[in-house]
């Protein structure tokens, strides 16, 4: 199988939405019965984003095979059916680490190790590995053209055209057309300079996707085509929209997918975007609104909870309601009080690390339990729910996690010291282990208790969900908590690790150690989130009576 490559770069400014544009294009190509994958090349020196602050970088998206990756991979999985793997995201740091290890082993036979060819060859090798078995591979280059950090990646994709042949490679450049209100027009000069910067590296873009808050007029498209040396039909206007799920239709309406198929000489049926039209129909036909409070640690940057926010929106689509998400700083619940929780139809506590804000989260979990408000706890959200229940129902005053209090009298949550990893080997950890690459991470099977709420939602006895954590429920103390009324509705396949807890006599109180948000999509939703939003709607309707 010959793989065709589409390289996506960005210019003028950052945060233009290269990931969304690439994912939307991939969705159209997939709808044409092509086998498609996407990868993200990040120019930072970290080995992976696993230890980068969510306030700086946004969420860490976890793949099925346990890779901690860029949040753009979440967009990829929400737009296409292909599951991402550790091969779909790598960084400058990972490339340099690999090359330096080879140098130490003597793999380069005494050669002087340089950016060209050693670093660029390593980049190309990884791209080819990730693209194997696919008709089309989209490669998004992180950063902005002109950044010094991106140069090795840009040089590598320049070389790849020669390696794979011009008929199997295509460059898309995403750029900004600012609109000047005083002049009443979009300005093309920044785009011209961005393309000029690319040309200086040796890359001539084949397609320009022009981002703007206004539609790009036909005469401006002609001007861009002339000065940037691209065909007019390859100048795509992509103005701001109120829903990212409209973008596949916008790109298709301008013939981008057909242009690419013609370039690659791909004979395939026209795209059937019926499923995306259904998503848009559901968005436009919401019959109500529910307010869900998300009590977190990193609310300054909503991207820190990107997949959770999207999963709530997906569940809203399936319930035909608009989900109004209120981001609540956990620490403020201690300083300002619980007034921020009043009027909510449901409460969600997402994942996180460290002790900051924990007591505020415990207050939120207690409020949801005592006021019979639907509650969904994810990862840390399950742990704080368990701590709260132990303290206030099971009589374990000052119960805590050893992450927050190593000397807790009742350590209801403790460090996982060993478990079986994806290779079947026993992984061992301690408090002194490195932070990076030392978690129980990736897809794990979970056995559900028949008759439980979770079992009713999933409608199957065994599920597979993705994890990312170091701490687990302490099985030595668990029987006391269960005797007080808490139910364990999901365990690992060896029955050693608690995965899901419920409160049977509460309208809807579910908390899980895994991250269900990573497998939610706009076309399918996710059972837990759909059930959660449905319960929020029921709570809202009851409050109106």
From Swiss-Prot:
GO molecular function, one term: glutaminase activity
Classification via CDD domains: CTPS_N, GATase1_CTP_Synthase
Regulation: Allosterically activated by GTP, when glutamine is the substrate; GTP has no effect on the reaction when ammonia is the substrate. The allosteric effector GTP functions by stabilizing the protein conformation that binds the tetrahedral intermediate(s) formed during glutamine hydrolysis. Inhibited by the product CTP, via allosteric rather than competitive inhibition.
Catalytic residues of the enzyme: 379, 515, 517
Location of region: Amidoligase domain: 1-266
Chain positions recorded as UTP binding sites: 14, 187-192, 223
PROSITE patterns: GATASE_TYPE_1
Chain positions recorded as L-glutamine binding sites: 352, 380-383, 403, 470
Residues given in the record as ATP binding sites: 15-20, 72, 239-241
GO cellular component, one term: cytosol
EC number(s) reported in the record: 6.3.4.2
Pathway entry: Pyrimidine metabolism; CTP biosynthesis via de novo pathway; CTP from UDP: step 2/2
GO biological process: 'de novo' CTP biosynthetic process; pyrimidine nucleobase biosynthetic process
Domain Glutamine amidotransferase type-1: 291-542
Positions bound to Mg(2+): 72, 140
Additional facts recorded: CTPSs have evolved a hybrid strategy for distinguishing between UTP and CTP. The overlapping regions of the product feedback inhibitory and substrate sites recognize a common feature in both compounds, the triphosphate moiety. To differentiate isosteric substrate and product pyrimidine rings, an additional pocket far from the expected kinase/ligase catalytic site, specifically recognizes the cytosine and ribose portions of the product inhibitor.
Protein name: CTP synthase
Source lineage: Bacteria, Pseudomonadati, Pseudomonadota, Gammaproteobacteria, Enterobacterales
């Amino acid at each position: 199988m010959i793989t065709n490559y589409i390289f996506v770069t960005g210019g003028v400014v950052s945060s233009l939405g290269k990931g969304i544009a690439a994912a939307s294009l991939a969705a159209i190509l997939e709808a044409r019965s092509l086998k498609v994958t996407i990868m993200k090349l990040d120019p930072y020196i970290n080995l992976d984003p696993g230890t980068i602050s969510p306030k700086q970088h946004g969420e860490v998206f976890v793949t099925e095979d346990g890779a901690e990756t860029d949040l753009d991979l979440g967009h990829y999985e929400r737009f296409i059916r292909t599951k991402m793997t550790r091969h779909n995201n790598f960084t400058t740091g990972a490339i340099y680490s690999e090359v330096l290890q080879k140098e130490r082993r003597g793999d380069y036979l005494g050669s002087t190790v340089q950016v060209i060819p050693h670093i660029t060859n390593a980049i190309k090798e990884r791209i080819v590995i990730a693209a194997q078995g696919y008709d089309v591979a989209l490669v998004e280059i992180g950063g902005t053209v002109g950044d010094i950090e991106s140069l090795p990646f840009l040089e590598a994709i320049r070389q790849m055209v020669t390696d794979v042949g011009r008929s199997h490679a295509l460059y898309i450049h995403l750029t900004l057309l600012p609109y000047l209100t005083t002049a009443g027009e979009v300005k093309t000069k920044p785009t011209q300079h961005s393309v000029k910067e690319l040309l200086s590296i040796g890359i001539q873009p084949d397609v320009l996707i022009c981002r703007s808050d206004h539609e790009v007029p036909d005469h401006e498209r002609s001007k861009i085509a002339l000065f940037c040396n691209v065909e007019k039909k390859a100048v795509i206007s992509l103005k701001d929209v109120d829903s990212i799920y409209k973008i596949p239709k916008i790109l298709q309406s301008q013939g981008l997918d057909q242009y690419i198929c013609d370039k690659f000489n791909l004979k395939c049926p026209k795209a059937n975007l019926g499923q995306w039209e259904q998503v848009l129909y559901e968005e436009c036909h919401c019959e109500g609104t529910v307010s869900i409070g998300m009590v977190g640690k990193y609310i300054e940057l909503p991207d820190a909870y990107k997949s959770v926010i999207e999963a709530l929106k997906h569940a809203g689509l399936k319930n035909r309601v608009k989900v109004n998400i209120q981001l609540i700083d956990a620490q403020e619940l201690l300083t300002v009080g619980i007034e921020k929780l009043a009027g909510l139809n449901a409460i969600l506590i997402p994942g996180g690390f460290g002790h900051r804000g924990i007591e505020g989260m415990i207050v939120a979990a207690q409020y949801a339990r005592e006021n019979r408000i639907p509650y969904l706890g994810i990862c840390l959200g399950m742990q704080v729910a368990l701590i709260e229940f132990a303290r206030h129902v099971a009589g374990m005053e000052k119960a805590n996690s050893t992450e927050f209090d190593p000397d807790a009298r009742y350590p209801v949550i403790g460090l996982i010291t060993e478990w079986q990893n994806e290779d079947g080997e026993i992984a061992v950890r301690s408090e002194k282990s490195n932070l990076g690459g030392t978690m129980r991470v990736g897809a794990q099977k979970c056995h559900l208790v028949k008759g439980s709420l979770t079992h009713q939602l999933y409608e199957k006895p065994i599920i597979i969900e993705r994890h990312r954590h170091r701490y687990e429920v302490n099985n030595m103390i668990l029987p006391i908590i269960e005797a007080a009324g808490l139910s364990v509705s999901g365990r690992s396949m060896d029955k050693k690790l608690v995965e899901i807890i419920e409160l049977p006599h509460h309208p809807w109180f579910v908390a899980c150690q895994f991250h269900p948000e990573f497998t939610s999509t706009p076309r399918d939703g996710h059972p837990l989130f759909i059930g959660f939003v449905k319960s929020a709607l029921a709570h809202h309707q009851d409050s109106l009576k």
